[in-house]
Protein backbone atom coordinates (compact mmCIF):
# COMPACT_ATOMS: atom_id res chain seq x y z
CA UNK A 1 0.00 0.00 0.00
CA UNK A 2 1.68 3.21 -1.16
CA UNK A 3 1.05 6.91 -1.50
CA UNK A 4 -2.11 8.39 -0.04
CA UNK A 5 -3.63 4.95 0.54
CA UNK A 6 -0.77 4.00 2.82
CA UNK A 7 -0.94 7.33 4.62
CA UNK A 8 -4.66 6.98 5.21
CA UNK A 9 -4.17 3.49 6.59
CA UNK A 10 -1.44 4.61 8.98
CA UNK A 11 -2.98 7.96 9.99
CA UNK A 12 -6.76 7.46 9.95
CA UNK A 13 -9.22 10.27 10.52
CA UNK A 14 -11.25 10.45 13.71
CA UNK A 15 -14.36 12.52 12.98
CA UNK A 16 -13.04 15.66 11.29
CA UNK A 17 -9.53 15.54 12.80
CA UNK A 18 -6.46 13.47 12.02
CA UNK A 19 -5.45 11.20 14.87
CA UNK A 20 -1.90 11.69 16.19
CA UNK A 21 -1.52 8.01 17.09
CA UNK A 22 -0.85 5.58 14.21
CA UNK A 23 -3.61 3.01 13.95
CA UNK A 24 -5.99 4.94 16.21
CA UNK A 25 -9.57 4.59 15.02
CA UNK A 26 -11.57 6.54 17.59
CA UNK A 27 -11.33 9.45 19.97
CA UNK A 28 -12.80 9.81 23.42
CA UNK A 29 -16.47 10.79 23.11
CA UNK A 30 -17.39 14.29 24.10
CA UNK A 31 -19.21 14.53 27.40
CA UNK A 32 -22.95 14.97 27.06
CA UNK A 33 -24.08 18.57 27.60
CA UNK A 34 -25.68 19.29 30.95
CA UNK A 35 -29.43 18.80 31.12
CA UNK A 36 -31.47 21.98 31.13
CA UNK A 37 -34.72 22.50 33.03
CA UNK A 38 -37.28 25.19 32.18
CA UNK A 39 -39.73 25.89 35.01
CA UNK A 40 -42.76 27.94 34.02
CA UNK A 41 -45.40 29.61 36.10
CA UNK A 42 -48.72 28.98 34.38
CA UNK A 43 -51.00 31.90 35.23
CA UNK A 44 -50.08 35.27 33.67
CA UNK A 45 -46.85 33.76 32.37
CA UNK A 46 -48.12 31.13 29.93
CA UNK A 47 -51.84 31.94 30.16
CA UNK A 48 -53.66 35.23 30.44
CA UNK A 49 -55.44 34.46 33.71
CA UNK A 50 -57.80 36.61 35.76
CA UNK A 51 -58.40 35.65 39.38
CA UNK A 52 -58.01 38.90 41.26
CA UNK A 53 -61.19 38.29 43.23
CA UNK A 54 -62.75 35.24 44.88
CA UNK A 55 -65.60 35.36 42.35
CA UNK A 56 -63.16 35.20 39.45
CA UNK A 57 -61.22 32.40 41.12
CA UNK A 58 -64.43 30.35 41.43
CA UNK A 59 -65.12 30.84 37.73
CA UNK A 60 -61.75 29.44 36.59
CA UNK A 61 -62.57 25.69 37.03
CA UNK A 62 -65.48 26.00 34.60
CA UNK A 63 -63.42 27.45 31.73
CA UNK A 64 -62.83 25.24 28.70
CA UNK A 65 -59.48 24.77 26.97
CA UNK A 66 -60.56 26.91 24.02
CA UNK A 67 -61.52 29.72 26.42
CA UNK A 68 -57.96 30.06 27.68
CA UNK A 69 -55.60 32.47 25.93
CA UNK A 70 -51.84 32.05 25.85
CA UNK A 71 -49.46 34.97 26.19
CA UNK A 72 -48.24 36.21 22.77
CA UNK A 73 -45.05 34.48 21.67
CA UNK A 74 -44.87 31.97 24.51
CA UNK A 75 -45.97 28.95 22.44
CA UNK A 76 -43.33 29.56 19.78
CA UNK A 77 -40.69 30.01 22.47
CA UNK A 78 -41.42 26.79 24.40
CA UNK A 79 -41.57 24.77 21.20
CA UNK A 80 -38.16 26.18 20.26
CA UNK A 81 -36.67 25.24 23.64
CA UNK A 82 -37.53 21.59 23.08
CA UNK A 83 -36.59 21.55 19.39
CA UNK A 84 -33.22 23.18 19.99
CA UNK A 85 -32.38 20.72 22.76
CA UNK A 86 -33.14 17.76 20.49
CA UNK A 87 -30.88 19.18 17.78
CA UNK A 88 -28.05 19.55 20.30
CA UNK A 89 -28.74 16.11 21.78
CA UNK A 90 -29.26 17.76 25.13
CA UNK A 91 -31.79 16.55 27.69
CA UNK A 92 -34.36 19.31 28.25
CA UNK A 93 -37.37 19.34 30.55
CA UNK A 94 -40.33 21.72 30.66
CA UNK A 95 -42.36 21.90 33.86
CA UNK A 96 -45.35 24.04 34.80
CA UNK A 97 -46.38 25.13 38.28
CA UNK A 98 -49.71 26.77 39.03
CA UNK A 99 -51.35 28.17 42.14
CA UNK A 100 -54.69 27.35 40.52
CA UNK A 101 -56.69 24.36 41.86
CA UNK A 102 -56.23 20.88 40.35
CA UNK A 103 -59.87 20.95 39.25
CA UNK A 104 -58.77 22.95 36.18
CA UNK A 105 -56.11 20.38 35.28
CA UNK A 106 -58.05 18.78 32.46
CA UNK A 107 -58.71 22.09 30.69
CA UNK A 108 -55.07 23.14 31.12
CA UNK A 109 -53.75 19.89 29.67
CA UNK A 110 -56.16 20.16 26.75
CA UNK A 111 -54.99 23.73 26.14
CA UNK A 112 -51.33 22.65 26.13
CA UNK A 113 -52.22 19.86 23.69
CA UNK A 114 -54.03 22.33 21.42
CA UNK A 115 -50.92 24.53 21.44
CA UNK A 116 -48.65 21.60 20.62
CA UNK A 117 -46.61 22.03 23.80
CA UNK A 118 -44.42 19.14 24.95
CA UNK A 119 -44.00 19.21 28.71
CA UNK A 120 -42.70 16.87 31.37
CA UNK A 121 -44.83 17.71 34.38
CA UNK A 122 -47.38 20.07 35.87
CA UNK A 123 -48.40 20.70 39.47
CA UNK A 124 -51.41 22.53 40.90
CA UNK A 125 -52.19 23.93 44.34
CA UNK A 126 -54.79 21.99 46.29
CA UNK A 127 -57.01 24.77 47.61
CA UNK A 128 -59.67 22.41 48.96
CA UNK A 129 -57.80 21.72 52.21
CA UNK A 130 -57.76 25.43 53.03
CA UNK A 131 -61.46 25.84 52.18
CA UNK A 132 -62.45 22.86 54.35
CA UNK A 133 -60.48 24.17 57.31
CA UNK A 134 -61.64 27.76 56.82
CA UNK A 135 -58.09 28.99 56.26
CA UNK A 136 -59.08 31.54 53.66
CA UNK A 137 -55.98 33.71 54.06
CA UNK A 138 -53.84 30.89 52.62
CA UNK A 139 -55.91 30.58 49.44
CA UNK A 140 -53.79 33.22 47.74
CA UNK A 141 -50.50 32.48 49.50
CA UNK A 142 -48.01 31.40 46.86
CA UNK A 143 -44.53 31.64 48.37
CA UNK A 144 -44.72 28.56 50.58
CA UNK A 145 -46.53 26.42 48.01
CA UNK A 146 -44.27 27.27 45.07
CA UNK A 147 -41.01 27.19 47.00
CA UNK A 148 -41.80 23.74 48.41
CA UNK A 149 -42.73 22.38 44.98
CA UNK A 150 -39.59 23.85 43.40
CA UNK A 151 -37.37 22.25 46.03
CA UNK A 152 -39.07 18.87 45.53
CA UNK A 153 -38.52 19.20 41.79
CA UNK A 154 -34.84 20.09 42.25
CA UNK A 155 -34.25 16.99 44.35
CA UNK A 156 -35.70 14.91 41.50
CA UNK A 157 -33.81 16.76 38.73
CA UNK A 158 -30.84 15.22 36.88
CA UNK A 159 -27.53 15.94 38.64
CA UNK A 160 -25.84 19.05 37.30
CA UNK A 161 -28.96 20.33 35.51
CA UNK A 162 -29.00 24.04 34.64
CA UNK A 163 -32.29 25.86 35.23
CA UNK A 164 -34.16 28.78 33.68
CA UNK A 165 -37.21 30.09 35.55
CA UNK A 166 -40.19 31.98 34.12
CA UNK A 167 -42.73 33.99 36.09
CA UNK A 168 -44.61 37.29 36.18
CA UNK A 169 -44.80 40.52 38.14
CA UNK A 170 -48.27 40.14 39.66
CA UNK A 171 -47.34 38.86 43.09
CA UNK A 172 -44.48 36.76 44.37
CA UNK A 173 -42.57 35.13 41.52
CA UNK A 174 -39.47 37.39 41.73
CA UNK A 175 -38.89 36.63 45.40
CA UNK A 176 -39.92 32.95 45.16
CA UNK A 177 -37.51 32.25 42.32
CA UNK A 178 -34.69 34.26 43.91
CA UNK A 179 -35.10 32.44 47.22
CA UNK A 180 -35.12 29.12 45.39
CA UNK A 181 -31.95 29.98 43.44
CA UNK A 182 -30.11 31.07 46.59
CA UNK A 183 -31.25 28.06 48.63
CA UNK A 184 -30.10 25.47 46.08
CA UNK A 185 -26.82 27.38 45.59
CA UNK A 186 -26.13 27.22 49.32
CA UNK A 187 -26.03 31.01 49.63
CA UNK A 188 -28.86 31.17 52.16
CA UNK A 189 -28.48 29.62 55.60
CA UNK A 190 -31.37 27.51 56.86
CA UNK A 191 -32.10 29.77 59.84
CA UNK A 192 -32.03 32.87 57.62
CA UNK A 193 -34.47 31.19 55.24
CA UNK A 194 -36.83 30.38 58.13
CA UNK A 195 -36.76 34.01 59.32
CA UNK A 196 -37.59 35.23 55.80
CA UNK A 197 -40.51 32.81 55.46
CA UNK A 198 -41.90 33.91 58.84
CA UNK A 199 -41.77 37.53 57.64
CA UNK A 200 -43.70 36.44 54.57
CA UNK A 201 -46.40 34.84 56.78
CA UNK A 202 -46.49 31.52 54.96
CA UNK A 203 -48.44 28.51 56.18
CA UNK A 204 -46.53 27.16 59.24
CA UNK A 205 -46.85 23.61 57.92
CA UNK A 206 -45.20 24.72 54.69
CA UNK A 207 -42.37 26.33 56.64
CA UNK A 208 -41.55 23.03 58.33
CA UNK A 209 -41.71 21.24 54.97
CA UNK A 210 -39.42 23.77 53.26
CA UNK A 211 -36.81 23.58 56.03
CA UNK A 212 -36.72 19.79 55.71
CA UNK A 213 -36.45 19.95 51.91
CA UNK A 214 -33.67 22.54 52.00
CA UNK A 215 -31.52 20.18 54.07
CA UNK A 216 -31.78 17.55 51.31
CA UNK A 217 -30.52 19.80 48.52
CA UNK A 218 -27.03 19.19 47.12
CA UNK A 219 -25.71 22.78 46.73
CA UNK A 220 -25.31 23.88 43.10
CA UNK A 221 -25.42 27.31 41.49
CA UNK A 222 -27.92 25.93 38.98
CA UNK A 223 -30.29 28.83 38.17
CA UNK A 224 -28.83 30.69 35.22
CA UNK A 225 -31.65 33.18 34.57
CA UNK A 226 -34.98 34.23 36.05
CA UNK A 227 -37.36 35.82 33.54
CA UNK A 228 -40.22 37.97 34.81
CA UNK A 229 -43.00 38.78 32.35
CA UNK A 230 -44.06 42.38 33.04
CA UNK A 231 -47.77 41.70 32.69
CA UNK A 232 -48.56 44.63 35.01
CA UNK A 233 -45.95 46.82 33.32
CA UNK A 234 -44.05 47.22 36.58
CA UNK A 235 -41.08 49.60 35.99
CA UNK A 236 -38.03 47.38 35.39
CA UNK A 237 -35.88 49.44 37.77
CA UNK A 238 -37.90 48.03 40.67
CA UNK A 239 -36.22 44.67 40.11
CA UNK A 240 -32.62 45.86 40.39
CA UNK A 241 -32.47 44.67 44.01
CA UNK A 242 -32.78 41.10 42.71
CA UNK A 243 -29.51 41.35 40.76
CA UNK A 244 -28.51 40.68 37.15
CA UNK A 245 -29.73 37.08 37.27
CA UNK A 246 -33.35 38.31 37.11
CA UNK A 247 -34.44 39.71 33.73
CA UNK A 248 -37.70 41.72 33.55
CA UNK A 249 -39.11 41.52 30.02
CA UNK A 250 -42.00 43.31 28.33
CA UNK A 251 -42.61 40.52 25.81
CA UNK A 252 -41.39 37.06 24.86
CA UNK A 253 -39.33 38.46 22.01
CA UNK A 254 -37.08 39.99 24.66
CA UNK A 255 -37.01 36.68 26.53
CA UNK A 256 -36.02 34.86 23.34
CA UNK A 257 -33.21 37.35 22.69
CA UNK A 258 -31.62 36.72 26.08
CA UNK A 259 -32.06 32.95 25.73
CA UNK A 260 -30.34 33.18 22.34
CA UNK A 261 -27.39 34.95 23.94
CA UNK A 262 -27.38 32.20 26.58
CA UNK A 263 -27.01 29.69 23.75
CA UNK A 264 -30.17 27.66 24.34
CA UNK A 265 -32.21 28.74 21.28
CA UNK A 266 -31.05 29.52 17.72
CA UNK A 267 -31.70 32.73 15.83
CA UNK A 268 -34.56 31.05 13.95
CA UNK A 269 -36.42 30.72 17.26
CA UNK A 270 -36.03 34.44 17.93
CA UNK A 271 -37.46 35.12 14.48
CA UNK A 272 -40.42 32.78 15.08
CA UNK A 273 -41.27 34.44 18.39
CA UNK A 274 -41.00 37.88 16.81
CA UNK A 275 -43.26 36.89 13.92
CA UNK A 276 -45.88 35.55 16.31
CA UNK A 277 -45.96 38.99 17.95
CA UNK A 278 -46.30 40.67 14.56
CA UNK A 279 -49.15 38.37 13.57
CA UNK A 280 -51.07 38.02 16.86
CA UNK A 281 -50.41 41.14 18.89
CA UNK A 282 -50.38 43.98 16.38
CA UNK A 283 -46.68 44.57 17.01
CA UNK A 284 -44.78 46.51 14.36
CA UNK A 285 -41.22 45.84 13.25
CA UNK A 286 -40.25 49.17 14.78
CA UNK A 287 -41.66 48.07 18.13
CA UNK A 288 -39.64 44.86 17.99
CA UNK A 289 -36.52 46.89 17.29
CA UNK A 290 -37.34 49.08 20.29
CA UNK A 291 -37.64 45.92 22.40
CA UNK A 292 -34.14 44.85 21.39
CA UNK A 293 -32.75 48.33 22.04
CA UNK A 294 -34.43 48.39 25.45
CA UNK A 295 -32.65 45.19 26.49
CA UNK A 296 -29.33 46.62 25.34
CA UNK A 297 -29.91 49.86 27.28
CA UNK A 298 -30.66 47.85 30.42
CA UNK A 299 -27.45 45.83 29.85
CA UNK A 300 -29.15 42.44 29.48
CA UNK A 301 -27.52 42.09 26.05
CA UNK A 302 -23.84 42.78 25.51
CA UNK A 303 -23.30 45.71 23.07
CA UNK A 304 -21.56 43.55 20.43
CA UNK A 305 -24.29 40.91 20.72
CA UNK A 306 -27.01 43.55 20.30
CA UNK A 307 -25.32 44.89 17.15
CA UNK A 308 -24.99 41.40 15.70
CA UNK A 309 -28.59 40.49 16.51
CA UNK A 310 -29.89 43.71 15.03
CA UNK A 311 -28.16 42.99 11.73
CA UNK A 312 -29.23 39.34 11.67
CA UNK A 313 -32.85 40.22 12.38
CA UNK A 314 -32.82 42.95 9.74
CA UNK A 315 -31.58 40.37 7.23
CA UNK A 316 -34.42 38.05 8.32
CA UNK A 317 -36.93 40.84 7.62
CA UNK A 318 -38.06 40.99 11.24
CA UNK A 319 -36.65 44.44 12.00
CA UNK A 320 -36.72 47.50 9.75
CA UNK A 321 -33.44 47.92 7.90
CA UNK A 322 -31.21 50.79 9.00
CA UNK A 323 -28.14 49.83 6.93
CA UNK A 324 -26.83 51.75 3.93
CA UNK A 325 -25.62 48.65 2.07
CA UNK A 326 -27.79 46.88 -0.44
CA UNK A 327 -29.19 43.42 0.19
CA UNK A 328 -26.43 41.46 -1.61
CA UNK A 329 -23.46 43.36 -0.06
CA UNK A 330 -25.08 42.91 3.36
CA UNK A 331 -25.30 39.16 2.82
CA UNK A 332 -21.62 38.99 1.83
CA UNK A 333 -20.72 40.99 4.94
CA UNK A 334 -22.76 38.70 7.15
CA UNK A 335 -21.13 35.57 5.73
CA UNK A 336 -17.62 36.99 6.23
CA UNK A 337 -18.38 38.09 9.78
CA UNK A 338 -19.88 34.68 10.71
CA UNK A 339 -16.69 32.94 9.60
CA UNK A 340 -14.65 35.22 11.85
CA UNK A 341 -16.96 34.86 14.84
CA UNK A 342 -15.36 33.07 17.75
CA UNK A 343 -17.34 30.72 19.99
CA UNK A 344 -19.32 32.70 22.52
CA UNK A 345 -17.92 32.40 26.04
CA UNK A 346 -20.67 33.02 28.57
CA UNK A 347 -19.21 34.51 31.74
CA UNK A 348 -20.81 33.70 35.07
CA UNK A 349 -23.52 36.12 36.09
CA UNK A 350 -22.44 38.18 39.07
CA UNK A 351 -24.94 37.52 41.84
CA UNK A 352 -24.75 39.98 44.71
CA UNK A 353 -26.24 38.94 48.04
CA UNK A 354 -29.90 39.93 48.22
CA UNK A 355 -30.99 41.70 51.40
CA UNK A 356 -34.28 39.87 51.69
CA UNK A 357 -35.65 41.56 54.87
CA UNK A 358 -35.12 45.01 53.37
CA UNK A 359 -36.44 43.90 49.97
CA UNK A 360 -39.62 42.49 51.55
CA UNK A 361 -40.22 45.74 53.43
CA UNK A 362 -39.80 47.81 50.26
CA UNK A 363 -42.09 45.61 48.18
CA UNK A 364 -44.83 45.43 50.80
CA UNK A 365 -44.64 49.21 51.29
CA UNK A 366 -45.33 49.55 47.56
CA UNK A 367 -48.53 47.53 47.91
CA UNK A 368 -47.24 44.26 46.45
CA UNK A 369 -48.66 41.10 48.02
CA UNK A 370 -45.72 38.76 48.60
CA UNK A 371 -46.77 36.26 51.24
CA UNK A 372 -49.90 35.23 53.08
CA UNK A 373 -52.33 37.91 54.09
CA UNK A 374 -52.37 39.12 57.65
CA UNK A 375 -54.93 37.61 59.98
What are these regions (language model features)?
Residues 2-8, 15-138, 210-213, 217-229, ...:
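Alpha-helical substrate-recognition element adjacent to the catalytic core
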Amino acid sequence: MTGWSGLLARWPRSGRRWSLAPGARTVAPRPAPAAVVYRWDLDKTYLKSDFESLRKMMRVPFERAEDKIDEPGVVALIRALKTSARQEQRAAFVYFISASPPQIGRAIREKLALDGIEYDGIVFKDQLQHLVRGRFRFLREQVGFKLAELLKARIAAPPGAVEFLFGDDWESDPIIYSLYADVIAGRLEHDALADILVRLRIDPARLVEIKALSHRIAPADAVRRIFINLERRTPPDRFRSFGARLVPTFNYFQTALVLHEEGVVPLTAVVEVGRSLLERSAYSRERLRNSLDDLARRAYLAPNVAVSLRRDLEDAGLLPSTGTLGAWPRQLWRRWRRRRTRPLVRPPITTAAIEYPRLIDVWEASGSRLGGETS
